[in-house]
């Protein structure tokens, strides 16, 4: 997705490092679900080398290191502070590479490549898939979670700002030349908050703000709060926020 400012994203996530683990409720659920799917898919796979793209502070890393503790792992994240935190879960030989996963010249080959809640930030997800295919042999597994249209839809409907999320059809097209799709499953995760301001606080503390600070003025915040309550209040008076994750697993073709 063109136009994404990765330096701005890196700064946001760096600021959110200390609060992310406490606030990222949806992402934690996604990691738990993803670990279950991955365990089934890789049951007969011998994993000697593995790469995690966008490891963040290690929410998925912790599961992965327990599941594939004998593998030589490479951990990557755009944010240097995050990957340093994630590396605390390392159980064996672990290589740490911070930087833009779309620009890094990957030279090693990996039996398993995984990513949780990261590729939605990529400018060219189709090119990223081709790059991953180049560092996997036949039978290698690529497993990732990302988000579909409908994610943070409440924010977008009011502010007209947010990411343009690819559809499952987009992902199938991009994968088709390189991988056989093993799994594509999606779900909806709905969080509730006391107030619309708590929604914005949640997004800020997880680094996934859909709007920049420069967008907000006092009057805009007031208008946002009124609109959010009107449109997205639950019967108990709380307000909702929707995530629409998808889990994708595929096997490298010949």
Language model: regions and residue ranges:
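Conserved class I S-adenosyl-L-methionine
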Residues: 143-168
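A short glycine-rich, Lys/Arg-flanked "PGG" loop and its adjoining helix->strand segment in the class I
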Residues: 126-138
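N-terminal, positively charged/glycine-rich alpha-helical extensions of SAM-dependent methyltransferases
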Residues: 1-19
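Conserved alpha-helix/loop element of class I SAM-dependent methyltransferases that forms part
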Residues: 26-46
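Conserved Class I S-adenosyl-L-methionine
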Residues: 23-26, 59, 164-166, 183-254
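A short acidic, Gly/Pro-enriched loop at the edge of an enzyme's catalytic core
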Residues: 102-113
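Class I SAM-dependent methyltransferase SAM/SAH-binding core
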Residues: 49-104
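A short SAM/SAH-binding and catalytic strip from SAM-dependent methyltransferases
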Residues: 112-125, 146
